[in-house]
Amino acid sequence: MNPDMPAAASALEGSSTWLLVLLGSLTATLLGVAHKLGLIYQLWHQVDMKSTRHGGETVAEVLKAHGVRFLFTLPGGHISPILVACEKLGIRVVDTRHEATAVFAADAVARLSGTVGVAVTTAGPGVTNTVTAMKNAQMAESPVLLIGGSAARLQKGRGALQDIDQLSLFKPLCKFCASVNSVREIAPVLRKAIAIAQCDTPGPVFVEFPLDILYPYHLVEREVFKNFTSKSLLGKIVNWYLRSYIGNLFAGAWEMQDLSPLPVNLPKASKGQVQQCVELISRAKKPVIILGSQVTLPPTPVKILRDTLEELGIPCFLGGMARGMLGKNSPLHIRQNRRDALKEADVVILAGTVCDFRLSFGGILSKRSKIIAVNRNREQLLKNAYVLWKPTVAIQGDAACFLVSLCQALKGYSCPQDWVTGLKEVDRIKEKANREKAEKPTEQHLNPLKLLHHLDNLLPEDSLLIADGGDFVASAAYIVKPRGPLTWLDPGAFGTLGVGGGFALGAKLCRPDSEVWIIYGDGSLGFSIMEFDTFVRHKVTLALPNLCSLCICGWDYHVVAKGLGGKGFLLNRENEDQTEELIRTAQSECRQGHPVLLNVLIGKTDFREGSIAV
């Protein structure tokens, strides 16, 4: 036997292994390329190279199918096809002066309409300018869809204009983030995003649209091959790759697809949990309900919830978007001395209310009270639990649905009237004291409490209030009374300044017949005063910005409003006796289609003494 045979066999075996590894790697690479380029899909689905249709049309069709009536934007080339297509389908496109305003407006529409609010911004800075507004929507649990443009897929990571990793920015802020990879993916991705935004605990979602997904085939082809002339072997390979790339973008693009809304799933209290709460409430002598913003969410109409609360007859404290739920002068609505009431209460229902800073992290609740907590979000449901407070019953479910079920199960229940009237009497005494404080002159300028009482006296029943500011707005929450359900908008737990302009825009579109007021602080006004330009421009077709803005500042902001095409008035100590007359004048100008800014100089009071402004 030849002694070299084992060595030769070993070498041959090694070569075979190397060849197998090489073939395996080559096969994997080819399969990866085939998958990336959708080569198998392209075998069965045609590309219509002559079609002038574009991805923006599909976006508009999906939005229309989901009942979207308004789209807010600051336009840019990356997203122009969406804007054009939406206008053609009758979706109102409203352009703002800042991208954050566009998201705030979408947020307001979501809250007031019960559907998703939509904002569309161009790539890079256009998208990054929305981060604060999207975080605000997340913390306010508002279903907002942000559509952002981006660089073409082929150019990502290669130094294209305004090309950044946008998805990484929004993953911590959004329930769902996605980048669309082909025209055929537009409908399923958007349907999924909109459903996720509204299911369980609502929140914002972000969908990125690369440039080459939105424009027609012939334009994308022209841009891809604009600088390509090579006819070498490598050039032919590159040409094949690029052709396959474009083919994948448009393969099956215009085939029929389902555009209808996907089902929205909501957590609900079980019958056993409701019965457990029935037993607690039926034995209660001093029950209290604290309602938070979650109770205004679909599917329960706010009118049905209001009827439910009135039938239960349990005294209520209202916070956030729930302000106004019981109207202006309900005997069940307790506005003052919440801390003292909670010390006495034997059963407290936290209906969509969170034990965060607004309830002293739960420390405001008595350890003797039986606590029923209801919230869609488990983390919020148990925030600070077993530290400063302890839930007797914790229900992960929709708060409004729970209250309706509780009322149905408590037929014949009557809350002790001495408890209700006692709380209301304390309320009356406190409000009388506030009115007395309002009559005390300040060292300079106007007493803000008196100003707010004047405003409250003149607000019509269809008015809608937007709170955008710090101390002044906190005072307004005690003095000014929202007229009904969903007539008060504030930023929510994030406490964002600058929501006013966007909220007003969205609110006026949803409620064109309402008188919309922004209660501004001087700092918050600075964030959105340029939106007076937006209000003026868009009143041409709908007279939508019939809003009054009440701000407190030392600068001539009323002159700025005039410069932007609106109306402006100054109210100070010199014309204090004309306060109600000026408010009526502002209202009259609004009815004639003019946005109005009432610039009021106010002095200091001790109304919020002891509060820390942070």
Regions found by a protein language model. Name each.
Residues 4, 17-25, 148-190, 208-215, ...:
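Glycine-rich, acidic loop regions that bind phosphate or pyrophosphate groups
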Residues 27-39, 58-68, 108-113, 196-201, ...:
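Glycine-rich phosphate/diphosphate-binding loops that line cofactor/substrate pockets in enzymes
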Residues 39-47, 220-225, 231-268, 274-275, ...:
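Phosphate/pyrophosphate-binding active-site segments
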Residues 8, 111, 290-380, 482-514, ...:
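Glycine-rich, anion-gripping cofactor-binding loops and their flanking helix/strand elements
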Residues 4-42:
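Terminal signal-anchor or tail-anchor transmembrane helices
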Residues 56, 77, 82-84, 426-513:
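Active-site diphosphate/adenylate-binding microenvironment
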Residues 147, 155-164, 302, 339-344, ...:
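Thiamine diphosphate
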